[in-house]
């Protein structure tokens, strides 16, 4: 999916539900923050845009009928899908698990146009990329790990930031979440920790030890090493000189 595809989906969805805003969940919400050219292929592979009418959050309205409208008129196998190649999946908020406070960090993706354009001002409110990654990792499916892993690999997302969001914000669990919540968080944290770069090794103790030796002895470290190496070579040469010539004693020549 490209940003131009997302714009078409937002405009069409807003038109069908007669609202100026929709909230975009799922992987394609990352396009609210980044152009597709800066994203890895794994992040924009899906042609599905998960969304729900914004009135579900702004007024607490029951959007069941509007969600159904989205699925019929701009959903999978709809005329919109067949024409544009992208489709909308209308969802309910209680199917998504997100960090607490996610609604205060939404990124507005507004359709281009002018004040005279009927599509002007139609907006998709996209998840913040860090909140999106938390949601993906709590779900914990293979495709979710692939998505977040690609963003980390390309240095778009820092795993430490995602860990920090989990630990400091906490999780806004949906009432219908069926799985073990503690286990879901533990798995997400473990996966993120495995993606963090290993800490640089600390060689300060070795440096201090070498410094102490150099101060306490008049010879330099290089001289110490040269002396030790020379001694080892002398011993090796001596041992070779006194060794018996087995080929002579046994009366045969060594061959290749």
Question: What does each model-identified segment do?
Answer:
Residues 200-255:
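Gram-negative host-targeted secretion-system effectors, predominantly Type III and Type IV
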Residues 1-212, 251:
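Compositionally biased terminal segments of proteins
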